[in-house]
């Protein structure tokens, strides 16, 4: 289908007109859908069309358009906020004013785009669907409504059978795609990935009507404060105020879509991050067959860190920009170098404005990549990447934003480095490592039961595949990386020198997280893994292929074990290699999927996961009841200013999101062991119903241990699931 520039301009203005009408009349569904499209897609599409970065695939175009849109909203929103405040407008983020200014920006971009693309046409692929494509895609289309209905059942009846069945259906679907992939059109794999991605990432977001997580309560407070104030500024925790991903960005989406703030904050980041497996697919497809790229993306998608993205809002946005940057850096052909560099700088700036720690790690990876490719360039025709000017800009932006403007993130980083250095003499003490590292090496494993032992084995099986893939790439580097005519049969093209160095770099980063004392205690290994898996997901698949190559060699050619090259030229051998590779990869991937999602634990009677259960530690700590929300709202309305509120650790976080009470007015009486005379005590559901307290350390304590703090307090509010005490 062909569309002229004029037709596209008319369509764009039509969409904008429809959205404005839906916004002003508050038309349900239309406002929500068009608001999301107008914000998350249109700015990036216009900028890319004006910018013309070069030859990119449709998938890359869509991914870059979303990334550019989000980056422009954050960076442009900050400039807009500061400019209007300077002009004396006290609430830049008010509905009609923001809509008018946004319309002007979009129309200006549209005018520039039309003038620069007046004589061009746009071609869409043939929309017809083959019968085989329909058969492969239709089952996946059922996943999304099933996911929503399954969570409705769990929230209302506690029945998790449908959700377990859904996860088994996804497992079968992945296997079916691997079997039938040769019959599918090229677009089926990314479409299936996106549907499964949203299906897996939504359950936690839909688990209750309120925020689920720990840090996410603090992040929500930053967002709701910006929304209520009508402007952005450093108002509370500078480390959170420095993250525009949880302040300015969700404010745009809330004002434009009209979705309730808490529901929007729970869902929007999950939906945005759902495109991340497609970035993995795009990266992997440069080097591997489509089905291998699909499995690399699937491996990234079934990680626990991916499925809990809704509780790590600022981290996942920074990670998304890191992934887009890596995708651009690894794309060596077809793009204009200067325009590619401009996009990289934009995504780097967006990552800096999203999350400080991820940005520090991001910068470190790029520095080591530059050093590594520089060393390779001394002997091989490899260009050092990224370029020095990108690193200088990255460092300068971090210094300005973290050291001069918001200050606290740089102070935290320096303190973290100093504390890590102070703990180097405790190298042999396991307790100086974080809980994630201790679990990785089986701490307390015999006491936990069979599902945890199986998860431990499967985790190490996946690590084993990654290690084998990395070693195979290094040992067979003449066929996998280094310039020359010889190429491994499973590769479409050889891995670039930059990719090779990135694999070594992120592997080294994981090694440091495990080896260096305090490093994983100060910053969880679980937060670093998604960054590393951006690259290592490809190595997971390569590891499966390497094992299959060895098995094929041993089984089929026992007499030619020293002549490996004999195997690589036969089409039948290549087909056999793919079948064996898929079998090896699925043998690890599918059981690991059941373990990572919590299905295995649930079937064995373990109530670990809040998504499946209405009891257990996660539920006690993170699930919010309606009674707790009503109690927090009552307290917010009636509490006197400058009077402190005490609660247990997870009660403190609830009061920030449910009552929008600043952290400076909150404290844990469990941590301090006392309360001030003029103060409030807030007891949540677990405290009132079960008589248990849970502080920031996750340990359970009896409420009776703190009976003395209620001696001079009276109960002034109770609803059966929360209570409030004061003088």
Task: Identify the role of each PLM range.
Residues 36, 43, 162-170, 315, ...:
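Hydrophobic/aromatic-rich transmembrane helices and adjacent perimembrane loops
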Residues 29, 35-38, 155-162, 177-320, ...:
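Active-site lumenal/periplasmic loops and adjacent helix-entry segments of GT-C-fold
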Residues 1-186:
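Membrane-embedded, hydrophobic transmembrane alpha-helices
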Residues 66-77, 81, 105-106, 144-146, ...:
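Membrane-embedded helix bundles of polyisoprenyl
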Residues 173-177, 370, 452-493:
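Hydrophobic, aromatic-rich transmembrane alpha-helices
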Residues 270-271, 286, 298-299, 315, ...:
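Extracytoplasmic
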Residues 2, 6-18, 141, 190-198, ...:
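Transmembrane alpha-helix segments characteristic
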Residues 25-26, 98-105, 213-216, 312-318, ...:
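Transmembrane catalytic cores of multi-pass membrane glycosyltransferases
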